[in-house]
């Protein structure tokens, strides 16, 4: 099977235009819709392609998943034990301290401020990732993807906490 970029007719680039991605995705969904098949075999084939298109779209539209996928295309798997130890002990310590702060914060406005800080950090990391992939600096891209993953974890925790206090 083609890689997700090829499947959706896109250039393999981290910095993709999300509107073009969406346009390509919907065009391909229409083209391979199972109801358009004339035979049972064609319908089954279209179901497989449609499922693959769904996976490709959900992966490429998400900045973190797209980065992980692009690294995977270069045989770099962030789920490997080695990749999990990319961040320094200081960075990991800060991450765990922040998790504790979030856990102990009960005032919604304080949680919103923390969330805004991490959304800004997430944007900065994504911009840095664009540059790392553009320069084909896979080492830097791997570290930045790992950081983005931790930031995402903090943001998810914040989201849940904010939702529970409203």
Curated annotation (Swiss-Prot):
Ranges for domain J: 3-73
Gene Ontology BP annotations: [2Fe-2S] cluster assembly; protein complex oligomerization; protein folding
Keywords: Chaperone
Pfam families for the chain: DnaJ (PF00226), HSCB_C (PF07743)
Keyword Isomerase among record annotations: no
Signal sequence, start to end: none
Molecular function (Gene Ontology), one example: ATPase activator activity
Cross-referenced PROSITE patterns: DNAJ_2
Domain of life: Bacteria
Protein family (similarity comment): Belongs to the HscB family.
Quaternary structure, from the entry: Interacts with HscA and stimulates its ATPase activity.
Cited function: Co-chaperone involved in the maturation of iron-sulfur cluster-containing proteins. Seems to help targeting proteins to be folded toward HscA.
NCBIfam families according to UniProt: hscB (TIGR00714)
Name of the protein described by the UniProt record: Co-chaperone protein HscB homolog
């Amino acid at each position: 099977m083609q890689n997700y970029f090829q499947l959706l007719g896109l250039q393999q680039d981290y910095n993709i235009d999300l509107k073009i991605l969406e346009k390509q995705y919907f065009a391909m969904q229409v083209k391979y819709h199972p109801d358009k098949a004339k035979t049972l075999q064609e319908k089954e084939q279209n179901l497989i392609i449609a499922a693959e298109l769904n996976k490709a779209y959900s992966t490429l539209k998400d900045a973190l998943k797209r980065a992980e996928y692009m690294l995977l295309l270069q045989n770099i798997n962030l789920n490997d034990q080695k990749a999990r130890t990319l961040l320094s002990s200081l960075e990991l310590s800060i991450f765990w301290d922040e998790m504790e702060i979030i856990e102990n914060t009960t005032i919604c406005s304080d949680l919103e401020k923390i969330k805004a800080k991490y959304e800004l950090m997430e944007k900065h990391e994504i911009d840095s990732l664009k540059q790392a992939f553009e320069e084909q600096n896979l080492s830097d891209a791997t570290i930045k993807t790992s950081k983005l993953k931790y930031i995402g974890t903090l943001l998810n925790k914040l989201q849940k906490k904010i939702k529970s206090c409203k």
